[in-house]
């Protein structure tokens, strides 16, 4: 399609209306490149995507997508074997996380039936291993300590050295206060210094790094911290080097996946663009038009998108209709109507909602041409008429039966009689070529052409004779008429002059009366249609209200089910806590062994009645709610014992999970981690923040280290450890005894062999300690 029409109708300004709805740079780039399409299938696909998005908002009320920066240049740099900086890696991390969120969102969707968006969601890929590694980059664009063991070591040393320097300088601040111009530790060239009065500069030995502008203060690095500061400088250099190495490693991790990540980024941007189209449609009461296959146009209550308070009009351009000629005086809105048609077509063919009512229909044109406004070329010294005619000649040479042509004031700028004849000849040529045309004119001769010629229809813009102002209402089928006599009378022209003028135009009076009658009939028809539309709107509101009530009822029902489940869980927890309290009191007041308490606890559990709840519909529904929170590949987690964030990468056959935590892979059971998403939901509900930082050292340990212990001490600790593990229902524990002389190892083996609650034990794998550690299964 020719680009000139986009400029003439200010299509770029229409595209700017969607900018506030976009969240990603990728979608902004897509909007910038948006142009009208000429294939009906592609347009239909765009409309189907908006319909799918509408389903999401109707059923789920939102479609969350985070702000994402463009990563296209970063991916190109990766393809050129370049390493990315921390900000580029952070942008890619957000794309990976957003991809995972979208996959989970799609898997949780209910009550929707997509036509197009399902393919987009299904083409998204997630990278749990990469996501786990990228947990080492926080949202502030900073590498966490656990990014690598070396980085953690360097930063720990750096912190210790800086603390020692501060302590030494703090002591000197107290001891040498009278020698200092300020009681503070300053920094010069990255080294910690003291601000010493110039008169006492020889009282503190060290390196002078700076002098104040007045010369009264000398910034000295005391000799006591010179070595430490040099160590800090070296550690900072080591830190930068290690960070660079880590960034290089991250870049290498990404390189094999560039194409897939690029596709993910495009899909996320496109989903954001579709979301913006829907929100634009919703806010502006626009609609998704139907696509005709026979060049039929039907725009119901169509509005100009760039006007603040546009008047809605109906426009019908049937298949057989070739031309619509809008006649009547200037300033009535003829040009606006012309542009409204053109913009509605451009928006529709670009896959955008059209500012019209439901039931509207657009055609698909290969080209749209327009001659609108004064396009006189000053450089070529062309007159207005010559400029327009040059443009019209170009249009007639290029237009075909798949084109739409728009003419504003066709034939203007020359002798009225010749101009009218030219206008009719041009329209006749286009009619015979089956080219759809809309033209405005103020020549009365074209009214007769519209009445007498097949497949050509007159139209006009309504004028209010009472207020002497245009209403901007489009009246299709009614030719325009002059309102000169009415206006002159209302403005005070003598009645006899007006009467004489009417007598001079007797030949036209009958035509004007017919036009007046047509206008009255059109207004009556419009009033009836408006009433019908009001009834339709009331019905639509009623249907929406019913659907809203149903959704609210479903939501409240689900809340009640959740509440019932929580109350049942609380009852069970209270009973278990009460039994634990009883056992604790027994333990405190008697000489019972811990394993005897375990036996007693098992007997208490046997006392609980076994109730068959398999047919309980309420609890079954509650179980489904709980099951919805089961972990999935790609979920972000917190490893409870370490307080570290990671990502689930796969599930083993025995039910355990593999997780990527920084650069480390871990194997975890379900109770050794918590889902970040679930934690965040609980934080919102409880209005408090509980972040696991470190396992409580006073609680039961899953690992016992006996290295360096005496035999008797080791056996006592082992006995206590096993009892505590059994009390806390631990299924598996690790005992580290080392190899050494083998005395403690043999003692551990004998103890485990005779303990009735030890189901199985064996040495650890070679990569986990070998014969220096024993893995024990309890039961």
Curated annotation (Swiss-Prot):
Entry's Gene Ontology BP terms: mismatch repair; negative regulation of DNA recombination; rescue of stalled ribosome
Entry-linked SUPFAM superfamilies: DNA repair protein MutS, domain III, P-loop containing nucleoside triphosphate hydrolases, SMR domain-like
Protein origin, superkingdom: Bacteria
Gene Ontology MF terms in the entry: ATP binding; ATP hydrolysis activity; ATP-dependent DNA damage sensor activity; endonuclease activity; mismatched DNA binding; ribosomal large subunit binding; rRNA binding
Span of domain Smr: 704-779
InterPro entries according to UniProt: DNA_mismatch_repair_MutS_C, DNA_mismatch_repair_MutS_core, DNA_mismatch_repair_MutS_sf, MSSS, MutS, MutS2, P-loop_NTPase, Smr_dom
Keywords attached to this entry: ATP-binding, DNA-binding, Endonuclease, Hydrolase, Nuclease, Nucleotide-binding, RNA-binding, rRNA-binding
EC number(s) stated in the UniProt entry for this protein: 3.1.-.-, 3.6.4.-
The keyword Membrane belongs to this UniProt entry's keyword annotation: no
Name of one Pfam family that matches: Smr
Quaternary structure and interacting proteins, as annotated: Homodimer. Binds to stalled ribosomes, contacting rRNA.
Protein's recorded name: Endonuclease MutS2
Organism in which the protein naturally occurs: Streptococcus pyogenes serotype M5 (strain Manfredo)
